[in-house]
């Protein structure tokens, strides 16, 4: 049995999340650090919503599918990415029900944190926005680049991963989630 790079990276992120979750003071300090990066509430109010399942369904999935269809990459069907989004949504919903005790940063109303409205208090783990954008991005990358070597593959993959990670981290920047939730 071989383990691919994405599985190994996922295991590393999972281990890191468990480590951070076991040290709440570290989660709070990381929240303060990332929250200090909020340079525009208007920008982040929209940017963080890129990970929303409906926005992914309406914009991200069609753009990724169209891009893979119109270039030399493998064509990734919209239906495939929609199914991935639905499966991720169901898994996140189940995990949120199982971890309903997890509180969001808004529960504590920390004084030196700039919260972006609306402020929710519960169901922090996992971040649905982060799971959706990262899941769809990684599935698209693995299908679009399977067996293909193009000159710009590294650049395209890096841009898609950068966008997915930026949207995921924006959930911490707007104080909707802890870093260990994403």
Predicted regions and their residues:
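Membrane-water interface at transmembrane helix exits
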Residues: 31, 64, 92-100, 141, ...
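Interfacial segments of alpha-helical transmembrane regions
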Residues: 62-94, 157
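Membrane-interface helix-boundary motifs at transmembrane edges
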Residues: 1-3, 67-80, 145-152
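N-terminal transmembrane-helix/juxtamembrane module of multi-pass inner/ER membrane proteins
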Residues: 1-59, 96-119
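Membrane-embedded catalytic cores of phosphoryl/pyrophosphoryl-handling enzymes
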Residues: 2-3, 113-182
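Hydrophobic alpha-helical transmembrane segments
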Residues: 50-68, 129-137
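Alpha-helical transmembrane segments of integral membrane proteins
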Residues: 4-12, 76-84, 152-159
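Aromatic-anchored segments of alpha-helical transmembrane domains
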Residues: 15-21, 86-93, 162-175
């Amino acid at each position: 049995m071989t383990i691919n790079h994405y599985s190994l990276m996922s295991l590393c992120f999972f281990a890191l999340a468990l480590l951070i979750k076991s040290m709440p003071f570290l989660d709070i300090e990381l929240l303060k650090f990332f929250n200090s990066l909020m340079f525009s509430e208007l920008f982040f109010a929209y940017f963080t919503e890129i990970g929303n399942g409906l926005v992914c369904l309406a914009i991200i999935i069609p753009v990724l599918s169209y891009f893979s269809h119109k270039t030399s990459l493998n064509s990734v069907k919209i239906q495939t990415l929609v199914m991935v989004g639905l499966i991720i949504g169901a898994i996140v919903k189940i995990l949120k029900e199982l971890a309903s005790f997890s509180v969001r940063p808004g529960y504590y109303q920390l004084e030196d944190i700039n919260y972006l409205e609306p402020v929710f208090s519960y169901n922090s783990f996992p971040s649905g926005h982060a799971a959706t954008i990262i899941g769809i991005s990684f599935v698209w990358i693995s299908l679009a680049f399977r067996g293909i070597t193009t000159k710009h593959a590294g650049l395209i993959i890096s841009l898609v991963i950068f966008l997915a990670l930026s949207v995921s981290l924006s959930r911490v920047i707007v104080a909707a989630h802890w870093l260990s939730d994403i």
